[in-house]
Amino acid sequence: MAQRAVWLISHEPGTPLCGTVRFSRRYPTVEKRARVFNGASYVPIPEDGPFLKALLFELRLLDDDKDFVESRDSCSRINKTSIYGLLIGGEELWPVVAFLKNDIIYACVPLVEQTLSPRPPLISVSGVSQGFEFLFGIQDFLYSGQKNDSELNTKLSQLPDLLLQACPFGTLLDANLKNSLDNTNFASVTQPQKQPAWKTGTYKGKPQVSISITEKVKSMQYDKQGIADTWQVVGTVTCKCDLEGIMPNVTISLNLPTNGSPLQDILVHPCVTSLDSAILTSSSIDAMDDSAFSGPYKFPLTPPLESFNLCYYTSQVPVPPILGFYQLKEEEVQLRITINLKLHESVKNNFEFCEAHIPFYNRGPITHLEYKTSFGQLEVFREKSLLIWIIGQKFPKSMEISLSGTVTFGAKSHEKQPFDPICIGETAYLKLHFRILDYTLTGCYADQHSVQVFASGKPKISAYRKLISSDYYIWNSKAPAPVTYGSLLL
């Protein structure tokens, strides 16, 4: 696993090139290995100028890039991985790992230890995951405590020396560049106990452990025969351990009720020291997989000082929390809408907020509205062609609510009115936004009494959980709609 080159590019809309290479590093020894491994399919690393132009074009970040380009924008080229192929001088440079964050484009080219023709599957290219870890480490270093451009420039000037230690000869040794900074500025001091690479100091103060479980539920609902509704839960467990000592040991347990949905596809933080194999083998890829493990999920770890994501997981819950249908029909100069939403009986009926956003794309401003709602309030944003149905904090006892009415629009202004290439004609959706505190759809919770801490002092244990909607769509059942098959992608 190694990297052939790395770039940091500032995105500057309005300038002639739309960007500037702030930092770049090439690794000639890795490039020689790439030439051997790739053989006839080898494509050399280009100069900064051609690379900058090709990358901005592929990311659609050029100011004059408004037209549809078949090779980049067709449905066969939908990119969901932040991994690209760049056409440079008639040849394609692949794989290029790149993403935009805080107006900085982070990019690198991992070494592929095999021929590139035919293109190997990404899962077989181990340098890709290391490339992401490398770029995320640089991002964390640049923006940890960074307050202004001068501090950013200072950190950019430190990168050449830091990468000599963190990534010598293109091989990543430590993604935490702060460790390399400490080694550069201070002489090494022999310590009685070695600290892990992700921990840069010790804590002094009142001991406490905080555990927060956040589940995001996605859904695409159609209310159509022959098209299956899809939904998926993605969970994140975030921890903050304020404990004295160089390497305090902690064991955190996640539990499920008897009717809970098993956790799958679990990814853990590097500070986890060991793990039951049953936790790692539970996968959502195979629908016939019977390896579901219902817990308890124990994570022994040596926590870092800062807040960290202990693990991520998915879960295949039996039903979405809110089921509904949306019907929109065009009648002469107005639209007739009918909406019905039903909260599942197993879901906690206590929201921090719950709203249904009903946008009308590719139309003029709302000039007239007549409606009837069984529950909640309706807000109208006329210029934005948007209705927001404020449901509030609870559904009624029936768990079912409805909204119906007619909407009339004025003349469309191309400059102000919202445009969407999918929502043409009667193709439309409503999007649900909600949050429920002290609740998870899987039932997953952190048992405060089962948290084991091997450190001085008795810590205060706090546990929180919440469910949040994410990409929760209900499409008009009277018109065509984009369809997702199988499980929703992360």
Swiss-Prot record:
One of its GO terms (biological process) is endosomal transport. Probably part of the adaptor protein complex 5 (AP-5) a tetramer composed of AP5B1, AP5M1, AP5S1 and AP5Z1. InterPro entries: AP2_Mu_C_sf, AP5M1, MHD. Keywords: Cytoplasm, Endosome, Lysosome, Membrane, Protein transport, Transport. It is a peripheral membrane protein. It comes from the Eukaryota. It is found in: Cytoplasm, Cytosol; Late endosome membrane; Lysosome membrane. GO terms for cellular component: AP-type membrane coat adaptor complex; cytosol; late endosome; late endosome membrane; lysosomal membrane; lysosome; membrane. The keyword Transport applies. This is AP-5 complex subunit mu-1. Its main location: cytoplasm. As part of AP-5, a probable fifth adaptor protein complex it may be involved in endosomal transport. The keyword Cell membrane does not apply. Residues 206-476 form the MHD domain. Belongs to the adaptor complexes medium subunit family.
